[in-house]
Amino acid sequence: MKPKFDGYAAQYDAWFMENENLFQSELRLFQKVLGDIQGKRVLSVGCGSGLFESMIDCSGIEGIEPSHDMGAIAQKRGVNVIAFGAIEDADLEENAYDVIYLNGSSSYMEDLTRAFNVCKKALKPNGKFISLDVPKESAFGFMYLLAKEAGTFDHPSLSGVMPKLPYPLEL
């Protein structure tokens, strides 16, 4: 099965660049919750193209990404992609990571409970687990679910429904 984002890596980054104010808002939130990661072992689950990681010092950040297209870009940006595949199927070292985060990737996981259990096992005692995502109960989350069912955001039935500014502009 072809990963969901293969063939869409360029569009993913382009969307954030076209919506720079939204990108900057999300980036500030990302930086705030991530905190100081110097000297820590960090894993990005669903690292995508490494766009957010490239805006911070991503040296040392490891990543797991189902899409080879996205992961290849992440590697070029400095993320050490340790696996191409779903977190649910990953065989991670126990108690290995100080920080594990999911930045917008949990809504694409087939088995969220299993994914979180894999992360829990790999997290060091007193480690930090971060999940940044759009709640499925929110208006934008509902749009994601509709687009997922339709197979695209470009489906005619979703025309004119997407909000222009889906994220908060200020944190």
PLM regions and their residue ranges:
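Short catalytic micro-motifs in class I SAM-dependent methyltransferases
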Residues: 104-105
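Conserved class I S-adenosyl-L-methionine
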Residues: 1-37, 39-48, 51-55, 70-73, 130-157
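Class I SAM-dependent methyltransferase SAM/SAH-binding core
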Residues: 48-89
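A short glycine-rich, Lys/Arg-flanked "PGG" loop and its adjoining helix->strand segment in the class I
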Residues: 113-125
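A conserved beta-strand element that flanks and buttresses the S-adenosyl-L-methionine
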Residues: 101
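Short alpha-helix
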Residues: 164-171
